[in-house]
Amino acid sequence: MKESEILYPSLSLSQYIKYYWVLKTDKIEPVMIQTIPSGCVHLVFHRGENLNIQAKGLQPKNFIRGQFSAYGSLVSAGNIDMIAIIFHPLGLNPFIQCPMSDLYNRYIDIEDLEDIELNHLKNSISSERNVQTCIQFIELFLMKRLIDIDYNHKRVQNSISQIINQPQIEVNTLAESACLGYRQFKRIFTNHVGMSPKEYYRVIRFQRVLYLLQNNPEIEIADLTYSCGFYDPSHLVKDFKEFSGCSPTQYLSSHSPYSTFFSEDCRLNVIKSNRFA
């Protein structure tokens, strides 16, 4: 049995959280899941078996997954009962007391953050079997930590909007729009998002390729190249291989392309649920 459910946050938290993803499975045989850079940070609570990071050992029981710049594989070898909070690009930043750059390419055990309230949330979720009650615990925790967004947060949010809406934009233009020198802009962006603006731009460009392939698998490579802001097809293929491990053609032969960044839903037999009040 496999059950995947998407739950949406309250309106007060919707600018921070894309969705909650609840995944349950009682399969015993190993299942491999490919991971790719998504452009988002995740806060994950395992109530069943931990997933195994191929060649690196088990994931922590409860952790933050920072921005990743490379593909990887997870292996499930037991019952999964997981609640994941999928944040918008800047969504986690206001709620924890560390730069997002410290999370880069890492799974950070919640216990290592020495955050008493977050550890209390972890324990509450571990002992509560009702998913909706767990989501209420999460929302209460986050609502208590809501703070006024600072000016640099707004600057970076505007830069992310430009990256999303203008695939041909030059990264140096982002600094100019923020009225900052590039080095200062890069430092602020990296601390808020978790990777440099150039690298983040490349991840979002890769997610855009997936989204266009998802909606039109027959799209011409030239159209895909231009629409996503690549110099030429070989540039597209090079980046795609770096982030997925294979060329677009190879990927299409073994995967159904899907962008977790640009698409509203998550795959795996999604059951849509109403937002929490």
Say what each PLM segment does:
Residues Q168, K186-N191, M195-Y201:
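Long, low-complexity intrinsically disordered regions
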